[in-house]
UniProtKB/Swiss-Prot annotation:
GO terms for biological process: ribosomal small subunit assembly; translation. GO terms for cellular component: cytoplasm; small ribosomal subunit. InterPro entries: Ribosomal_uS19, Ribosomal_uS19_bac-type, Ribosomal_uS19_CS, Ribosomal_uS19_SF. One of its GO terms (molecular function) is structural constituent of ribosome. Belongs to the universal ribosomal protein uS19 family. Keywords: Ribonucleoprotein, Ribosomal protein, RNA-binding, rRNA-binding. This is Small ribosomal subunit protein uS19.
Length: 91
């Protein structure tokens, strides 16, 4: 279930300030953030945001198709190494 329309999308204040500052300065450097729950807004298009996955910051380049999604959706937290084989092998 999504967030109520009267409340509007959630975005961390510090992240929004950094994005707006880069827009006014015409700067496109990487922005580090731990806010995985922030919603991607149209002002973020063209920026690269490094989203923390619990271990490292994963750079995410924001495109138009990402608007409305959360930043955490693009930085996976778990690594899938495949199913383990039997130790005994085939008999």
């Amino acid at each position: 279930m999504g967030r109520s329309l009267k409340k509007g999308p959630f975005i961390a204040d510090s992240l929004l300030k950094k994005v707006e500052k880069q827009n006014t300065d015409n700067d496109k450097s990487v922005i580090k953030t731990w806010s995985r729950s922030s919603t991607i807004l149209p002002v973020m298009i063209g920026h690269t945001i490094a989203v923390h996955n619990g271990k490292a910051h994963i750079p995410v380049f924001i495109t138009e198709q990402m608007i409305g999604h959360k930043l955490g959706e693009f930085a996976p937290t778990r690594t899938y190494r495949g199913h383990l084989r039997d130790k005994k092998g085939a008999r």
